[in-house]
Amino acid sequence: ALEVGPGARKQILHREEDPFLFFPLPRPNLIVASMWSITDFREDNGATLLVPGSHQWDKERVAKEKEIRSAEMPAGSVLYWLGGTLHGAGANSSSDWRYGIILTYSLGWLRQEENQFLDVPPEVAKKLPPQLAQLIGYKTYDSLGFSINPEYPLEQDS
């Protein structure tokens, strides 16, 4: 979960795809991000800021203030954007906390941002339904090869 507390400053605009420097900007879409609002997202409590179209920009291009949009939405809403889009949390000038959950979806051949092998060790993952274990990375992506067990790593004995 992400939180923006009273008095928080505006976050620096960034891209979810910034770690993937091997593709120059603009690049093919690698990630789709989603922000689920737990509380109302308002301009005064730090609603997510987005720069529409910035996924098509060169790295040197800087957003002008008039290009930045505040994603105001009621609790229970979801916002989707391409991973190359500039975004960040807005400043919170209110007395309210702003809460949200961000989930990102990447191409199957990219390494996940979170290391699920540390968060969910194999002995725990073996007890999960197979589809859930696969979704969190316990199945290698089809077609790239160079892996020990491309079918299902949990079937290996350690």
Describe the role of every protein-language-model region.
Residues 8-72, 110-120:
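Catalytic core of non-heme Fe(II) oxygenases with the double-stranded beta-helix
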Residues 1-6:
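Short, glycine/charge-rich beta-strand/loop segments that flank catalytic centers
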Residues 57, 61-80, 84-85, 90-158:
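Conserved double-stranded beta-helix
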